[in-house]
Amino acid sequence: MGIHKLMDLLKEKAPGCIKTSDLKFYAGRMIACDASMAMYQFLATTSSASDFQIQNLTDKDGNKTGHLVGLLNRTVMLIENGLKPVWVFDGKPPQFKSGELARRQKAKDEAAEKQKTAIETGDMQEALKQEQRNLHITKEMKADAIKLLQLVGVPVILAPCEAEAQCAALAKAKKVFATVTEDMDALTFATPFLLRNLNSKKEPITEINYEKMLQELKLSHNEFVDLCILCGCDYLGRIEGVGPVNAFKLITEHKSLEKVLEHMEEVNKQSTKKQKYTVPSSYDYVSARDLFINPEVTDPETIQLEWKKPDVEELKKFLVEEKGFSEQRVTSQMEKVLNAKEHKGSQTRLNDFFKVQPKDTSSTSKASKKPTNTKSANKKGGKK
């Protein structure tokens, strides 16, 4: 879900922080991409409905491959346009998110039942709709995605927890320029730049500038975090009676969730009819706030980003022999990678493009000590 209707709020209250650009504008930039979010998108867009069944891209054993098709195409598109993608995968979800995960699982179970009913009645469009609400990323699918990206030669990072938080940490440490995800909570994790709508090189990219956003909203980072929690986030249920515009008004006036909740309590006491605000019984905003301000991430200073030449032969074995891809298609995509160009009039030599990036010595946040990435050591985190 991310942050409920945050984009709509920014369009109204902080339009100057949003701009659109062509993909070529970011040539030469390193970007951290939320792999988990992208995989769900790719699975959804590669499903279709026939008169009698739901059709998915699969290998010879019936395993879905739509996420691999999408990751390959997206990665090649970015490299071909001069960008340097880093793919970041989710680790374990925070324990505090268990309630939201349970809610999502219930929704998936309901979608599965509705899909079954739709198939029985022959309504394949409804069945497809419910199929897309019941998508799962298995461990095997994740492992295949990582293998694909490593064979293509791009860096892969296994985050200890939330991928968006790790992407934001990399961007704050200037290891990359921006976070690429559709989830608006990357801003709550304070990514300097958020890029959305990298779905096609034909569509403009939406860029959100974090510092300009705070300036236009006239909020500090902590106040913005409280605003996001009040709007509705993945960690907590929403307060009945509060929409994004009202949430912004309350935070602007009262500056913190503590003061907002005190105000709500007073308003409810004075109400002679139905209470205006209904706060969930387990509204642990303090823990939610801490997850945003002090997320569990790998220390960016321990991460070395390295772009390598693709292992074309191994990639063909994996995609063509195991996953049923067209050899011609794989060859064509790898030729695009090997012929990658900068898009500002100059051509980049292959050895320049796939070189080890120098270690960045810029400041970074504290993070988790738990080792989850083969190319980095994690450090457990204190306050940022």
Curated annotation (Swiss-Prot):
Residues reported in the UniProt entry to bind DNA: R74, E162, G232, D234
Binding-site residues for Mg(2+) 1, renumbered to this chain: D34, D90, E162, E164
Location of the region described as Disordered in the Swiss-Prot/TrEMBL record: 340-384
GO cellular component, one term: mitochondrion
Major localisation: nucleus
PTM annotation, UniProt: Phosphorylated. Phosphorylation upon DNA damage induces relocalization to the nuclear plasma.
Cofactor note: Binds 2 magnesium ions per subunit. They probably participate in the reaction catalyzed by the enzyme. May bind an additional third magnesium ion after substrate binding.
GO-annotated biological processes: base-excision repair; DNA replication, removal of RNA primer
Co-factor requirement: Mg(2+)
Protein origin, superkingdom: Eukaryota
Residues covered by region (N-domain): 1-108
Positions of region (Interaction with PCNA): 346-354
Residue spans crossing the bilayer: none
Stored Pfam families: XPG_I, XPG_N
GO molecular function, one term: 5'-3' exonuclease activity
UniProt subcellular location: Nucleus, Nucleolus; Nucleus, Nucleoplasm; Mitochondrion
Enzyme Commission code: 3.1.-.-
Region (I-domain): 126-254
Chain intervals with Low complexity compositional bias: 359-376
Keywords, sorted A to Z: DNA damage, DNA repair, DNA replication, Endonuclease, Exonuclease, Hydrolase, Magnesium, Metal-binding, Mitochondrion, Nuclease, Nucleus, Phosphoprotein
PANTHER family linked to this entry: FLAP ENDONUCLEASE 1, FLAP ENDONUCLEASE FAMILY MEMBER
Subunit (UniProt): Interacts with PCNA. Three molecules of FEN1 bind to one PCNA trimer with each molecule binding to one PCNA monomer. PCNA stimulates the nuclease activity without altering cleavage specificity.
Family statement: Belongs to the XPG/RAD2 endonuclease family. FEN1 subfamily.
Function: Structure-specific nuclease with 5'-flap endonuclease and 5'-3' exonuclease activities involved in DNA replication and repair. During DNA replication, cleaves the 5'-overhanging flap structure that is generated by displacement synthesis when DNA polymerase encounters the 5'-end of a downstream Okazaki fragment. It enters the flap from the 5'-end and then tracks to cleave the flap base, leaving a nick for ligation. Also involved in the long patch base excision repair (LP-BER) pathway, by cleaving within the apurinic/apyrimidinic (AP) site-terminated flap.
HAMAP family per record: Fen
Protein name: Flap endonuclease 1
Lineage: Eukaryota, Sar, Alveolata, Ciliophora, Intramacronucleata
Gene: FEN1
